[in-house]
Design a protein with these regions (language model features):
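Bacterial Sec-dependent N-terminal signal peptides
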Residues: 1-10
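A cross-family detector of function-defining hotspots
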Residues: 33-150
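Terminal, regulation- and interaction-focused segments at domain boundaries
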Residues: 13-36, 44
Length: 150
């Protein structure tokens, strides 16, 4: 499920085609995941072409929460590490909304203690939590320009 972060252009192209075939099946099977432990969804992802190369969280806004705290309520799984996504100007993302509300700083603190296995630690933490929603997107990263370049 977790992959090496280095790939050739040909490997990335092959993976992209497999992802384009796999990800729409998540939409078709969504009802099989919602209300079930996240382990069922992660088992499907583990057996697919989608390799987790980065994880982010779905979190509440500090503006909406008491004392500016933020809470984790889901995960964003990325098929590329940040540097590669920025270079390629695209990334596939699976978003999983969970029936949970973890305080963000404690969540990330616990993950950081796992060292290089931090992504695996995050997934393990979520396995028994019920899935409320799952979606995906092929996100294109826009070209960044400064005001002096315009």
């Amino acid at each position: 499920m977790y992959a090496q972060n280095t790939q050739t252009d040909a490997e990335r192209e092959r993976e992209s085609k497999m992802l384009e075939a796999f990800l729409p099946t998540l939409d078709a099977r969504k009802s099989k995941f919602v209300g079930q432990p996240a382990k069922k969804l992660f088992d499907v992802i583990r057996g697919s072409a989608f390799k987790i190369r980065n994880i982010g969280t779905e979190s509440t806004s500090p503006w909406a929460e008491y004392k500016g705290k933020t809470y984790v309520y889901g995960l964003s799984l990325f098929n590329k590490p940040v540097q590669q996504a920025m270079k390629d100007k695209e990334v596939y993302i699976i978003r999983i909304i969970l029936d949970v509300r973890w305080e963000s700083s404690a969540f990330w603190d616990a993950a950081s203690h796992a060292g290089p296995a931090w992504m695996e630690a995050i997934v393990r933490k979520c396995l028994d939590v019920k899935v409320l929603d799952v979606s995906w997107e092929h996100f294109y990263i826009p070209e960044r320009t400064t005001s002096s370049e315009k």
